[in-house]
């Protein structure tokens, strides 16, 4: 059974699924910038409402959203822990030598964890509602104007597409390898230490499989006489529609809302 991870696509025919991939990529960039400018929990609440609206319209099950974000939550945990010792304002709650945790550091850690989680949820919405080939085509079309100055737009799009395609397969093979190790009698213990030990036992067969898939992919591309963008055509042309304009308006409203909230706190 395939493991649902970041980069997986959930088939559907919602208004979000039908958006042009260029619109999703551009608005995704605006969303990231908007989320980075948020300076309060009220602003994060408006971003959270925006994300809930997206997933409600796209009709992607919540369990798949959480499953796609699960591999990235370790990054959130690391960022939160680092922020525990960054802001030392307010009353000190715990201290050990030069390390101390205060009310301000707890607030900062919670804020950064929420912000990063919302950013991941927003970007997961793009990969969950857009096939990899469409994302690759959209990314390539956005970079096409820079091809005149020597930027390899097609090659960069191909790299992004291959990376996104291999993420779910990488997660699936990691689970299969871990299950195979457990079925052969490998001890699986809970907690962070057990996870590190299990990761060490699956690392070699996992990366061996990754290199094998890479070699198979290169052989398949050579067999199909792939020589880059030259001479390639596309079956479906990318076109903007009314839905793309509406999505841009909604994203602009989110940006305006965040700006207003930030100005009120100044």
Predicted feature residues:
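Membrane-interface helix-boundary motifs at transmembrane edges
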Residues: 60-66
């Amino acid at each position: 059974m395939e493991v649902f991870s970041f980069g997986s696509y959930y088939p559907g025919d919602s208004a979000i699924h039908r958006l042009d991939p260029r619109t999703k990529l551009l608005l995704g960039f605006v969303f990231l910038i908007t989320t980075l400018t948020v300076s309060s929990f009220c602003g994060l609440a408006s971003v959270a409402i925006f994300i809930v609206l997206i997933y409600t319209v796209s009709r992607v099950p919540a369990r798949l959203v959480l499953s796609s974000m699960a591999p990235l939550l370790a990054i959130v945990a690391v960022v939160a822990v680092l922020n525990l010792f960054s802001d030392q304002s307010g009353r000190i709650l715990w201290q050990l030598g030069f390390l101390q945790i205060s009310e301000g550091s707890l607030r900062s850690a919670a804020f950064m964890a929420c912000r990063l989680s919302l950013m991941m949820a927003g970007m997961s919405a793009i990969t969950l509602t857009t096939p990899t080939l469409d994302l690759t085509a959209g990314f390539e079309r956005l970079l096409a104007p820079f091809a005149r100055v020597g930027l390899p737009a097609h090659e960069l799009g191909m790299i992004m597409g291959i990376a996104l395609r291999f993420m779910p397969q990488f997660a699936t093979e990691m689970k299969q390898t871990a299950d195979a190790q457990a079925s052969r009698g490998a001890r699986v213990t809970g907690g962070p230490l057990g996870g590190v030990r299990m990761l060490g036992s699956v690392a070699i067969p996992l990366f061996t499989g990754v290199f094998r898939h890479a070699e198979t992919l290169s052989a398949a591309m050579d067999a199909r006489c792939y020589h880059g963008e030259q001479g390639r055509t596309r079956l479906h042309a990318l076109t903007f529609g009314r839905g793309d304009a509406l999505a841009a308006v909604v994203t602009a409203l989110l940006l305006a809302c965040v700006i207003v909230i930030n100005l009120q706190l100044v």
